[in-house]
Swiss-Prot record:
Belongs to the secreted LysM effector family. Disruption phenotype: Does not affect virulence on Arabidopsis, N.benthamiana and tomato. This is Secreted LysM effector Vd4LysM. InterPro entries: LysM1-like, LysM_dom, LysM_dom_sf. It comes from the Eukaryota. Residues 116-129, 206-217, 296-317 have a biased composition (Low complexity). Residues 108-139, 206-225, 287-317 are annotated as: Disordered. The lineage of its organism: Eukaryota, Fungi, Dikarya, Ascomycota, Pezizomycotina. The gene is Vd4LysM. Keywords: Chitin-binding, Repeat, Signal, Virulence. Residues 57-104, 149-195, 237-283, 326-372 form the LysM domain. GO terms for molecular function: chitin binding. It comes from Verticillium dahliae (strain VdLs.17 / ATCC MYA-4575 / FGSC 10137) (Verticillium wilt). The LysM (lysin motif) domains are small globular domains involved in binding chitin in eukaryotes. Vd4LysM contains 4 LysM domains. Might have a role in sequestration of chitin oligosaccharides (breakdown products of fungal cell walls that are released during invasion and act as triggers of host immunity) to dampen host defense. Does not play an important role during host colonization. Residues 1-24 form the signal peptide.
């Protein structure tokens, strides 16, 4: 029988094959055939469920390359582990959303309590519960289970847009989609929200139905419906908010101050982001008196800041700096960009000198003077 010569390299390879595998699994890596930028890391790049396991040591930033049902095989884990680490995902892989980060490894996790195994059934495109209603995927986090009508959230949609289109109330929408939150900050685009439930028909407002009004209170003032959320109870003058109305438009028309408007309608918020169309806002209260309108023939009063010798015209933008030496009268309809271009200044400086305008310039007030230059 001829002799066989074994090289040292071959011998090392044979020895490695005989050594038992280590009990610690290697860090999971995505398959090479997955289109890659770096989608896995020790820190999440996208928003993630706050109930994700605290001891997560490796994350997958989901951009849709790997279906939910394939995640365990891709990362060398079980579906039970994956669902336990990421409780926002349902047993049928619902709520596995693009643009979210998910845990694919947990170091130092306590052994799970034995129980009913989690299903590993591949997710269907839709879920059909016992009530016979097909639920499209993905859905808003925390959506109720008895939903029978859905609305797909497109990029840029606002809660107000959905309520107006679906003819449902704000209270019902938040009740059926609790994770959206009362300020609508949890509304996720490219998901489906609940806009109707089994056993409850949303109220539809028709053009022939007069808006309901509550019983006239003891002060004799009838409050029209619907109203801005959180509106004060001693209101005696109301303004109907049409589509496209801005806080500035209402203040100018009603000749009231910004401070009073926000005090009487606190849910509107200081940046006017909570102003709901097709509702009534309070623009006057019992015992309160709105400031009289400024006559068009009256020259705006001026003040002279001490020491700098510069006369400051009034009224001015809220939050304007005190060391301003150049001013621009803001006409109704002017935008920050128009002023910046005309005055040859930067947007950063304009917002810094007129902080009340807001970083997005959403609170630029017409018929006031803005600062466009400083000492």
């Amino acid at each position: 029988m001829p002799s066989v010569t074994i090289s040292s390299t071959m011998l090392a390879g044979l020895l490695l094959m005989l050594v038992p595998a280590s009990s610690a699994a290697p860090r999971p890596q995505a398959r090479e055939d997955v289109p890659m930028r770096l989608l896995q890391d020790a820190k999440p790049a996208f928003p993630y469920d706050p109930n994700t396991i605290a001891k997560c040591s490796w994350w997958w930033d989901n951009e849709g390359q790997i279906p939910c049902a394939n995640m365990p095989a891709e990362w060398g884990i079980t579906m039970q582990d994956f669902l336990r680490w990421n409780p926002s995902i349902t047993s049928s892989c619902g709520n596995f959303l693009n643009g979210r980060s998910y845990c694919v490894e947990a170091s130092g996790e306590e052994p799970p309590v034995p129980g009913t195994p989690t299903t590993t059934t591949a997710p269907a495109t839709t879920t059909k519960p016992s009530n016979g209603i097909t639920t499209p995927q993905p859905i808003q986090d925390g959506m109720v289970g008895n939903c029978n009508k859905f609305h797909y959230i497109s990029e840029g949609d606002r809660c107000q847009d959905i309520l107006s289109y679906q003819k449902i109330t704000l209270a019902d929408f938040f009740k059926w989609n609790p994770a959206v939150k009362s300020d609508c900050s949890g509304l996720w685009s490219k998901t489906n929200a609940c806009v109707g439930v089994v056993g409850q028909a949303p109220a539809v407002t028709t053009t022939t139905t007069k808006p309901a009004t509550p019983t006239t209170p003891s002060n004799g003032i009838t409050t029209p419906q619907p109203i801005q959320a959180g509106m004060v109870g001693n209101c005696n003058k109301f303004h109907y908010i049409s589509e496209g109305d801005r806080c500035q438009d209402i203040l100018s028309y009603q000749k009231i101050t910004q401070a009073d408007f926000f005090k009487w309608n606190p849910a509107v918020k200081s940046d006017c982001s909570g102003l709901w169309s097709k509702t009534h806002a309070c623009v006057g209260v019992i015992g309160g008196q709105a400031p009289p309108p400024t006559p068009t023939t009256t020259k705006p009063t001026t003040t002279k800041p001490p020491g700098n010798g510069v006369t400051t015209p009034t009224p001015t933008q809220p939050g304007m700096v005190t060391n301003c030496n150049k001013f621009h009268f803001v006409s109704p309809g002017n935008t920050c960009q128009q002023i910046v271009s005309y005055q040859k200044i930067t947007m950063a400086n304009f917002v810094k000198w007129n902080s009340g305008a807001g970083s997005g310039c959403n609170n630029l007030w017409g018929n006031t003077h803005a600062c466009v230059g400083v000492f």
